[in-house]
Amino acid sequence: MLYEDNTEKEVCGYEISGFDNMKVEPQTVTVTYKSYDNLCYNYKKLRGESMKVNYNSTIRSCFIGYIVQAIVNNFVPLLFITFQSQYSIPLSKITLLITINFGLQLIIDFASAFFIDKIGYRLSVLIAHLFAALGLISIAILPDMMNDSFMGIFISVLLYAVGGGLLEVVVSPIVEACPNEHKDKTMSMLHSFYCWGTAGVVVISTIFFNVFGIDNWKILALVWAAVPVINGLTFLKVPIAPLINEEENGLSLKELIKQKAFWGFLLIMCCAGASEQSVSQWASAFVEKALGISKSIGDLVGPTVFSVLMGISRAIYGKFGEKINLYKMMVFSGCLCVLSYLMVSFSSSAIVGLIGIAVSGFSVGILWPGTYSDASTSIKGGGTAMFAFLALAGDVGCAGGPTFAGKIAGMLGDNLKMGILAATVFPITLIITLIIMNLHKKSLYNTKYL
């Protein structure tokens, strides 16, 4: 930073010279992570540096950030049966951990709209990685240290849920802020890493348990904890661009909620989350029946197949997105999702049902990241609050979709196929909302909807 006598010669890692000829009134400023990031961004912009090259490291760190989120969401559920036998914890209490994890993430989604802009993205993403690492480390230590093993697991889940919730809110806008010609492609590729992370956690953990034994799960927990630790350290150095440039006026929360498009995107996001999870949770059952494998293997293969297909969908758009119209892609994906639901609901063949599960995973891939990109393009100055509430809407859909499908199935004699058929209301609502917003944009602005 610069001192009053201009003796400091370095800003953001660059040598500075020529201050003797500059007429600058010395002043004392308070530097925070947020102001320092903005200073670095504006200084590099003044130098005319290549922003694409400079921000590759930032984007890579964000990709790994989504792998961290996949770790905290998917590793511990693999240990539920182990917790039940090792610590004599009732299964009813163990399944409560899922509700705690995603419930706290919902709270973080909402709360982050009010504090992230105040502390800045760098500090926020560092805190997210810290809590994720602490949660994974503590789950290997606290259950044996505390008299009540469940409380040790409970505290650990609370810790990594804070990290997971923050990561979901901050990583996407950090990538969105990076100067890039095709931000929708990058956003889709970013979200594909959650899918690869999910598949990787399941496959690597399964291999570890089979080679070294399930009793050594604590060692693996510490290995997974190294990922947020190492990636968190990279966020100390990578450049972070401001989501809203200084010359732009960001929308206040009151101004944001007055935007009709904002509410449309919230509905789309909620439907995207519901469409993704309504079938995802039943993937294991269809895989077990179609392939004639055990439940334990099916519980691993089903979610992996779904995640891999979803990741492939996002990676394809991430690679060829500049040749694909996002609006048409999302409408097509919604229609494909409806078709996959019908395959699962009406087919008497387990193989066709399995194909329907795979098609469902592929179809929902673009919906979540596509909504992020479209909202950012359409609502200028939406900022952190917009991303936070979009994440909240998506998580509400993820929780509500399977619940709705399960309730309908229960009312019809535990007929899961009919529950999934009823869940077609989510992709259908998504399609209708997309079309209405497209027509609305054309009539107001005489421009194409993406």
What are these model-derived regions, one by one?
Residues 76-77, 260-304, 308:
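Extracytoplasmic gate region of multi-pass secondary transporters
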Residues 96-114, 304-316:
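Central cavity-lining transmembrane alpha-helices of secondary-active solute carriers
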Residues 108-121, 313-325, 409:
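Helix-to-loop junctions at the C-terminal end of transmembrane segments
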Residues 130-147, 336-348:
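C-terminal ends and interior cores of transmembrane alpha-helices
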Residues 166-179, 366-379:
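Intracellular juxtamembrane helix-capping segments at the cytosolic ends
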Residues 185-203, 388-401:
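Glycine-rich segments within core transmembrane alpha-helices of 12-TM secondary carriers
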Residues 189-240:
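Helix-loop-helix hairpin linking two adjacent transmembrane segments in secondary transporters
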